């Protein structure tokens, strides 16, 4: 897709914004304050695609997204892995020795705590990394800095005082590319693919064990299996899973047949090309 609009959660300059421009440079990135708003923009047709983070190599899964996916009606058509780098930025003319306070999301400050400690900065948490940069641009302060992606510094006219200050340089976020198209074009023939799905097993003894048996006996590689509660109920457990392959593959067809027999709900969220980044890890 070479035109149109792509939704993301956050403000202009966020990591999700960077992911949008890297994957779809000809599309217009459209910020939304919440994941719910981003999903709704895709469903309503205001945006043709969405770039949604689902997990981070340090912080783990994005819980809000896992709850939204099954009920969204959206399909996953792609994935992107993005290395995450944080920059320490301030208003023009400010020097490192002038700083006393740093502002950003709590998780961003936590991931850069070595630099924050070394500079002796007091942490001030806000809701968004790019938002921290925007607030600093709107209210200049010679003693305050922000931790945000490099794109935020360019957008809001801030100077980068220290680059790539994250403690761990293998910090990576995985994004899903979403569409409202109920029957999206399948991945190209021959491409390595991933299929994502959700299910809830029937109330039977060893139902989960039995539901999973078909994947082992048919040689299907399951790369992810996560549980989460539905509507806050401890007794209603959903499972989110990912496997290598396409639903039309004979082995996966047989595995899904066995899964559905032991499940009261089963839904494929999408089949999409595996990001080449997977081969680097």
Model features per residue range: what roles?
Residues 1-281:
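Domain-level signature for soluble enzymes in the chorismate/prephenate branch of the shikimate pathway
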